[in-house]
């Protein structure tokens, strides 16, 4: 529940989440009891079988007056990084979180091939700041984060992905590449454009971020690449294998997903780190000049 959310907005979301059957009935009951004037922001964890009074009670609790656990997952965090953060903040253990992720996946209805994935739900938990009750379980956390991603992927965005010929899995995979490569929102659509351009001409993506992800089975323990790493064969080595990797390499934020859906219309094929962002080029000879300029700066 966000600051300023109306009873109408809350009721529609509860219906979408399957908590209530009728948003209209919920609003009428809420208005009768004055709930529409008492809604407080925060994360709700509603157990199956909860009564409407239980839901009203959660909606009206001032979370600033009760102890809550706050955890932030930056955009681009992997599931492994999320697990470690939860353990570091003593919310749940990393092992329990990853076990809960797997259980949620097994209970879900996903239609992608998971045989080459280290964590099948990589990319499917929305990175954000969450507030949980002190007795929250790993299952609760995974459910809240997965459903938040489902909310972000609106029907309009799903339709747009279909128009582009992308499944949701491919969309999140592409968005995760943009997330890991971009310096900021200003260049996400440009990088997305490069991805589409390379895919269109059957060119290797050659993204270092995907190679790093595959080196340590999704744990991202490596902080730099060696030339020999680019030759090591694994499913996420986009220097060796054409097309998108088999799945997301991180959990993308809203801006990267939007960029993947609405890429910049450009003819760039190359980019390299520049001053405060990336330098993009259409021709390989220009790319080599940009690479040389980057090396000269790092040698200074």
Where are these predicted regions, by residue range?
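Signal peptide-directed extracytoplasmic domains
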Residues: 1-152
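Bacterial extracytoplasmic/cell-wall-associated proteins, especially those involved in peptidoglycan
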Residues: 80, 85-92, 103-300
